[in-house]
Every structure is written in structure tokens, then in C-alpha cells.
Amino acid sequence: ALIAARAGAKIILVDEDFILGGSFNGENIQINDGICSDWLKSVLNELKSLKNVRLMPCTTLYGSFDHGIYGALEVKSYNSRNTLKKPRQVLWKIYSKFSVLCTGALERSILFENNDLPGIMLSKSVRHYCNRWGVIPGHNISIYTNNDDGWETAKDLKKAGCNVVCIIDQRSNIKPPVENIDHILGGNVLKAKGNLRISSIKLDNGRVINTDCLAVSGGYNPNLHLTCHQRGKPKWNEVNQCFVPHNLPKTMEVIGAANGVFSYQKMFKDSENKLTKILKNLGYKKIAAEEFNITNKVYKVSPFPKK
């Protein structure tokens, strides 16, 4: 959005959260020698100062239609809701020359018995509760994963002073990315036990681990729904074990995790390259590339091993 805005294009930035910025609001990665949330604030401040930019938080883009038309539902702020003269919700019809989807990806769970007990959460949710809201979801936290992102949760929880009991990774051929935490490689959770909430987990080797919170990460599925509204057909990405957008409309591009790109460095570079091409085709001036010193996030995932 910032690259396009600096080039002089009229921008509408739609985000379903009440704070713009996506997952950067709950991460601890470094950008240009500072935490990503600080970098995000500077970007948003610049966007707010530009007259050619319209920011629309609390807004869900629900439909992609012919001729670059999109449907969006905006939920007004609580202050507006308390005023009878103003609407609580607004239905928008947006006409665009081009759209860039940065809708991210949803984390997958992993199946095991009683995996719906209270206290069992997706790994990224646990991490964001800690980083964004300062909330500890449990006193003795375990992590069950088949990818590197589960270890990122362990790293952030440990940094915040949480007690990470154990990491169970389905993969057996990896070097643990985080040190000084008990871990089991090539292991699987068979069953969760508890009454009102989880109290322990049983592994396939017979070991029982006492825990009051289990963070689960089974990889990510890109949010590609809007790319399918005009006959787009997703294709399978074997490396990241997920479906990615394919056969996009001519006036649509997908960037970042929504396109199956999970490395932050590749994400920034991919965004810059695609936006430069889009702006050139639309007749806007070229903007000088901005250098980013960003923490490299390694993302490797393996399917559930066959026994």
C-alpha cells in the first residue's frame, strides 16, 4: 500500500482488524534494527498523512466480482454505534482498476483425541495472546507442531518468561531451532486429557506430559477465497504443503503468505517486484526501492508421517 501510495495511486486499504497491520501486530521480528510493531506505526502514520489513501479498518471484503468490483462490509466504531443518527454497519461497493490481496494464511490444527478441550489452541494464537495482548494462556505450555513456526511460538513464550514444558515435533530429521527447551522429535500426541480444561497429553511413545495449554501448529493454508470468485483454481504447492492461488483475473495480484510465501525477506522482495510491475503497467512513476533489514523467518513443514 505504501509503495503504491508514494507513486501517486489512489489507494483503499481494507483490513478486518480494528488495528491495521496484520500479523505484525503480534510478532517480535526485527525490521531495520527495531521491532516490527514500531516499523508498522511509522508506515501507518505516513499512510494516514497521504490524501490519496483511504484506510478502512474493521472492514471485511466478502466478494470479488467482474470488472474489478468488490463488496465490503464495514463495522463502525463503538462510539458510532452509540449514536442513533449514525449507522452501525456500512455495505460498500468498491470499483478498482487493480487489486492486491495480502490476506495472509490460516494456521491448521492437527487431529488427535479430545483436541477440542479448552486450553488447546493454535500456536500462532498463543503467540499473539502473549506478544500483542500480554496474556499468558497457560502456566505450563506444550507445543505440538510439524513445522518451524511452532518453534517461533516457543521462542517468544520463553522470551516473555512463560514456562514451556515440551515441544513435540512430528519431524525427526531436523535440528531444534530453539535451545534449552525439552523437545521430542518424531513424536505425536495421541490424546489430550482433562475435565474442565486440558490437564495432560499422552504421546505415541507412552509418555504423559502434564500441561494446561497445548499450542498446535499443522502448517498454514493461504486465504485464497477471493481468488476463486471469478473461476480461479488453486494449485498444490508441494514444498509448503498447501494450496496457492492460480489462474488469477488480469486485474488481481496476490502477495505474501496468501500466495504461499512465508519467508519475511522473500515476502518484502516479492511485494516490491510485483508492485513495481503493476504500477508501471498502470502508468505511475517508479519509486526508488527501500532497503529492509528484516529477520529471516525460515518455514519448513512436513506432512503427517506414515506409520
For each predicted feature, which ranges?
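Residues forming the flavin
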Residues: A1-K307
